[in-house]
Design a protein with these regions (language model features):
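Active-site scaffold segments
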Residues: 162-209, 214-218
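Surface-exposed, secretory/extracytoplasmic low-complexity segments enriched in Ser/Thr/Asn/Gly/Pro
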Residues: 1-159, 163, 210-212, 217-220
Length: 220
C-alpha cells in the first residue's frame, strides 16, 4: 500500500481503493438483513434504503492523505448517509416507525416507548400493489398534499389528503377518511395503491411527532 522512494512516501491509490472496497460491507448497512426486537415482536427483514453508507471516494482520499504523512492517525469513517443508531450492531436506535403487514398495524416508538399504536390498511395484495417490505428512511412530511398516480386499468387518480409522510417512492403514511374501518384482512383485496392508510385522528397524531430520516421498518 505504501513505499518509500528518495525519502518520500508513495501511496498506492489502487491498493487503498481495494482496501476500502473490502471494508465497505462492514461499515455500510443499506439493504442489510436485520433481526430486530420491535414493538410488534422479534422480526427479520431485509432490503430498503435506510442505513449507513460509506462514502468510498471521500474515504480513499482521507486515507491516502493520512498515509502520506507517515504518522499514526485515528481516522473516522466517512459516510455519505447515516442512520439513527450506531453504525454497527443496532443501526436503528430506539426511535422508529414499525409497520406489520400481517397484523395491519403501525407502532411509533420514541426513546424505546410506544407513543402511537393504530390499525391501518396497507397495499392491495390481489392487485399487486402490496406495500414494500424493508427498512426505509422517512423522506419528509407535508400537509396538505395531493397524491397522484395510475390505477391498474391505466386510469389516473388524484386524491387529496391532509397528512402525507412518504418513506419510499410513492408509498407513505396518510389519512384515509373514506375508509370506515382499519385492520383485519381488508388489504388483501381492498387495500391501497401501496400506501399505509390511517384513521384521520391517528395520521394527525403521527404527523406531529415524526421527523425526516426516521427509520421505517415494514415487515410481514
Amino acid at each position: 500500500m505504501i513505499s518509500v522512494k528518495n525519502d518520500r512516501i508513495i501511496v498506492d491509490r489502487k491498493a487503498v481503493e481495494k482496501f476500502v472496497d473490502k471494508k465497505y460491507a462492514y461499515f455500510s448497512t443499506i439493504g442489510a438483513t436485520r433481526t430486530l426486537k420491535l414493538a410488534g415482536g422479534t422480526i427479520t427483514v431485509s432490503g430498503g434504503n435506510y442505513g449507513y453508507d460509506m462514502d468510498k471516494k471521500k474515504q480513499v482520499k482521507s486515507l491516502v492523505k493520512a498515509l502520506e504523512t507517515g504518522k499514526d492517525h485515528n481516522l473516522k469513517v466517512d459516510y455519505e448517509q447515516k442512520g439513527w443508531g450506531v453504525a454497527k450492531g443496532n443501526d436503528i436506535g430506539n426511535t422508529y416507525l414499525e409497520v406489520s403487514i400481517g397484523r395491519q398495524h403501525v407502532w411509533m416508538v420514541r426513546n424505546g416507548k410506544i407513543v402511537l399504536s393504530t390499525p391501518v390498511v396497507t397495499g392491495n395484495v390481489a392487485e399487486g400493489n402490496g406495500t414494500p417490505y424493508g427498512t426505509f428512511s422517512l423522506m419528509y412530511k407535508t400537509s396538505p398534499a395531493t397524491l397522484e398516480g395510475e390505477n391498474n386499468d391505466g386510469s389516473k387518480y388524484k386524491t387529496k389528503v391532509n397528512y402525507w409522510m412518504p418513506f419510499f417512492a410513492g408509498c407513505g403514511f396518510h389519512d384515509a377518511p373514506w375508509r370506515g374501518s382499519f385492520g383485519g384482512s381488508t388489504y388483501l383485496r381492498n387495500g391501497s395503491h401501496g400506501c399505509v392508510n390511517m384513521p384521520p385522528s391517528q395520521a394527525f397524531a403521527l404527523y406531529g411527532i415524526v421527523e425526516a430520516g426516521m427509520p421505517v421498518i415494514v415487515h410481514g
